[in-house]
Structure formats: structure tokens, C-alpha cells
Amino acid sequence: MTEPAQWKIDFVKNLENEINSRKVAAIVSIKGLRNNEFQKIRNSIRDKARIKVSRARLLRLAIENTGKNNIVKLKDYAHGQVALITTDESPKKIYDILEKSKTKAPAKGGEIAEEDIVIEPKETNFPPGPKISEFQKAGLPAAIEKGKIVIKSEVTFVKKGDVITREKALVLKDLEIYPITAGLDLIAAYEDGLIFNKDVLSISDEKIMSDLASAFLGAKSLAIEANFIVPEIVPDMISKAYLEAQSLAIEANFVDEKNIDIFIRKAFINASAIEALINKDLNNEDITDKKEEKAEEKETSSDEDAASGLGALFG
């Protein structure tokens, strides 16, 4: 069996020391990241974390050799083009730092569109020339207006999930449209025996606090309903018992100095309701009387008209 090269042995040992020297070890994807972009990110987080690019197989071997509790599960995420990050910051904080460091970059061709790439109608800075045929060949409704190449109408240039061809990548660069998110993509992180994947780390602080508050209120409500006494619900239980006692006293017409104002308000409300009913009945009687008076007046008027007619007939 061939012995591994000494540089590989030394490199793996160096990775082991890195992992053991910090509380947190994370695996990040560097796929598609240009060297200048990588160096810029490395410099921006230098005071918080260290980054080492490694072959995935060597990184998996180093993770196995560290002996940290449960860290061996982290090697399942070491595939493809990856790097190791070690830090004393929390996994969530280092994830947020990496997300904020991401920038938009031009497509080179061959990338998958992260979302629909829509080009709006616009005037470009290009004069008439070979560019117009390049734009048209790539699928843009290009024309010449006032000595400039213009895009005549909105077009979905590349649909989400489609491959950005080299031809279209060049057009996008000409139009200064940068559709690629460039940065280190944190895949998973280890801390104190736990593995945190991207799905967990991507949850916002606001979402975490909202979920905790909802869970607390739900548990509190359940404890109150079940009469399960814990310190957090004692004030609520006292308030609930007081309100139930007040309600029972009112139903039983039991008056004391604590609830007499409730009985007074109740009596006032009842009196107001009775007064309203009486006024309604009186109004109804007035309306009936007026209708009867009008009917009598109408009958009298009819009788007088009839008598007048007969008088005129018989002279």
C-alpha cells in the first residue's frame, strides 16, 4: 500500500489543530467563487474567523481524527469544492456575517439562474454596430433609436432554474446586469456536540423570538386551563379566580363592598333599558292616536262632501 505524501499528512494534522483550537468548525462551499472574491471575504472576516481551503477527502479525514464529541457527523457535509472555517463566534453569527458579505457578480456562462432574469425596456450606451446583432441573436428585442441601441420591450431573458449560456452571460455583462450571488455558502457548523445545518442557521432572530413568544403563550394558556401551577402563571390564576368569584357573586346577587359598583351599574343599565322600552311604547301609542285622528278627519270630510253634493243636486 502506497504511503500518503508527507504534505498530505502535515496538511490534515494542521486542519485537526485548527478544529481543536476553536469552539466552532464550519464547512462552506466555494463553488464558482473567483479568487479575488474569496480573498476579499477572507480579509473581511480575518479578525473573527480563519478559512482554509481543502480537498473534501482530506477535510473529512481531519474531522474524523479530532475526536471532538459528535463532530464526526460534520464530515457528511464535506463534499465538492469546500473550505473549513474555524471561529469562536457562534454558528448563527458567522452565518450572518457570511451572508452579509455576499455580493452580486456577473455570470460567466454555465451557472443556474437563481431567479428570473428580466430585462426592462431601456436605452443602452452602445452606438449602432455589431452589438445589436449580438443582442438580437441572444433573444433581445433590440433596435436603433436616436443613434443608440435600445431594448424595445420587457423580456424574461433567462428563467429561474435555467442555465445561463455563455452567449447570454456576455450580453448581461454588457448591460451591467449581475445575476450571480457571490460569497461563501455555509453548509453546516459544529459547536459543543451539535451540528447546525443551513436550514437552521438561516432562520432570522425575529423569527426565533416570535416562535419562542408563541410557544410560551401557548404553554401558559395550557397550564392555566389544566390548573397546573407554576410561578409564571400564578398572577394569571389569581386574576382568573377573582373574575370567576365576581361572576358567581353577581349571579347569586351576593353584594359586598367589592362588587357593589357592579350592581349599581347593572341596575342603571336595566333602568335605562326599561325607560327605553316605555318610551318606545309611548311613541307607538302617539303614532296610533294620530292615525286614528286622521282617519276620523277623513271620514268627517267625506260625509261633508257627500252632503254638499246632495244639496247641490236637489237645490
Swiss-Prot record:
Alphabetical list of Gene3D superfamilies matching this protein: 3.30.70.1730, 3.90.105.20, 6.10.140.760
Residue stretches of biased makeup (Basic and acidic residues): 287-301
Region (Disordered): 287-315
InterPro entries reported for this sequence: Ribosomal_protein_uL10, Ribosomal_uL10, Ribosomal_uL10-like_insert, Ribosomal_uL10-like_insert_sf, Ribosomal_uL10-like_sf, Ribosomal_uL10_arc
Superkingdom, taxonomy of origin: Archaea
GO biological process entries: cytoplasmic translation; ribosomal large subunit assembly
This protein's UniProt keywords: Ribonucleoprotein, Ribosomal protein, RNA-binding, rRNA-binding
Entry's Gene Ontology molecular function annotations: large ribosomal subunit rRNA binding; structural constituent of ribosome
GO CC, alphabetical: cytosolic large ribosomal subunit
Pfam families, alphabetized: Ribosomal_L10, RL10P_insert
Family per similarity comment: Belongs to the universal ribosomal protein uL10 family.
Subunit structure as annotated in this protein's UniProt entry: Part of the 50S ribosomal subunit. Forms part of the ribosomal stalk which helps the ribosome interact with GTP-bound translation factors. Forms a heptameric L10(L12)2(L12)2(L12)2 complex, where L10 forms an elongated spine to which the L12 dimers bind in a sequential fashion.
Function: Forms part of the ribosomal stalk, playing a central role in the interaction of the ribosome with GTP-bound translation factors.
Protein name as catalogued: Large ribosomal subunit protein uL10
